[in-house]
């Protein structure tokens, strides 16, 4: 259905001598985003990583890990871990962007798009926007399950929404990075394997599940400079949840919100152009 819409749009452009414009590119992005959302509706199991996984992770870490976890000052582990679970679920689910692009390239779908005078980058932008909407669903699931297991934010609604916004911005930035992995891989399975090797340590070598206070010094440095730690700490601060800090922390530890925004913007600035370059190279004869 989306291919037909693109064909109709392309034909109308040719008849009126259409020149590329921002409005036309935006329309291409909307069509490509809708195409990805339609695929999800036809195969709802694609949403398991943003619906089922958050529920399992929340129950597992709150009731299993939380039963033996002691935080400084006797803070609630549930309140501590929910922002970490939010970030971790968004990080692990971001690999769907790379796998989806690798799938489209391997099954010839992108070759069909090349026959149309559409904005080529709309394939990438549409994919990342659709995955951003999936990430928003994941955030909502984490919040609902968190409330069910006893998590409560300590700040006003606007601050809480800002926390979700920071997490979603990082998720969108990471989607561009995983898009590069998908474009470098020759098969979806390869993209998944490589992505797992990158995403797994990124998610777990951080303060998402445990404070970095008692980690070995060399590991604590890595965890403190991990962008996942900055995002998680900033979300905790915006939510008004416990965020134990070392007495003498590094710059990202002392300024988590600034570090999270810098990491996100820098990742988009680097990964988006690189993904566009890789896409042109993969789709140019």
Task: Label every model-predicted segment.
Residues 2-14, 239, 243, 251-285:
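Junction motif at the cytosolic side of a transmembrane helix
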Residues 2-8, 24-31, 204-249, 258:
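Short hydrophobic, aromatic-rich alpha-helical segments embedded in or entering the lipid bilayer
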Residues 6, 12-53:
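Aromatic- and glycine-rich beta-strand/loop motifs that create alpha-glucan
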Residues 32, 50-51, 81, 85, ...:
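Residue-level recognition of transmembrane alpha-helices
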Residues 56-61, 77-149, 174, 178, ...:
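Hydrophobic alpha-helical transmembrane segments of multi-pass membrane transport proteins
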Residues 61-70, 92, 149-154, 158, ...:
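Short helix-capping/hinge motifs at transmembrane helix termini and TM-loop junctions
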Residues 63-68, 182-229:
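Transmembrane helix segments
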Residues 120-195, 255-276:
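Alpha-helical transmembrane segments and their short interhelical loops
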């Amino acid at each position: 259905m989306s291919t037909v819409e693109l064909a109709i749009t392309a034909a109308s452009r040719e008849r009126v001598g259409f020149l590329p414009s921002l409005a036309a590119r935006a329309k291409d992005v909307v069509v490509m985003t809708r195409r990805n959302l339609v695929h999800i509706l036809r195969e709802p199991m694609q949403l398991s990583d943003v619906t089922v996984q958050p529920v399992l992770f929340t129950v597992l870490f709150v009731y299993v890990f939380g039963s033996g976890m002691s935080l400084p000052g006797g803070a609630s582990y549930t309140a501590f871990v929910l922002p970490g679970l939010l970030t971790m679920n968004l990080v692990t689910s971001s690999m769907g962007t790379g796998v989806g692009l690798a799938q489209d390239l391997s099954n010839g779908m992108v070759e069909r798009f090349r026959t149309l005078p559409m904005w080529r980058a709309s394939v990438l932008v549409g994919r990342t926007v659709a995955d951003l909407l999936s990430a928003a669903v994941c955030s909502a699931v984490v919040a609902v399950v968190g409330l069910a297991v006893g998590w409560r934010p300590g700040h006003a609604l606007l601050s809480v929404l800002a926390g979700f916004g920071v997490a979603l911005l990082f998720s969108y930035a990471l989607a561009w990075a995983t898009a590069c992995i998908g474009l470098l891989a020759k098969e979806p399975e390869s993209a998944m394997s490589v992505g797992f090797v990158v995403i797994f340590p990124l998610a777990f070598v951080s303060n998402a599940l445990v404070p970095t206070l008692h980690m070995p010094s060399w590991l604590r440095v890595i965890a403190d400079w991990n962008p996942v730690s900055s995002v998680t700490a900033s979300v905790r601060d915006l939510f008004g949840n416990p965020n134990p800090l070392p007495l003498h922390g590094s710059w990202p530890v002392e300024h988590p919100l600034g570090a999270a925004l810098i990491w996100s913007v820098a990742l988009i600035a680097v990964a988006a152009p690189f993904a566009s370059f890789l896409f042109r190279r993969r789709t140019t004869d």
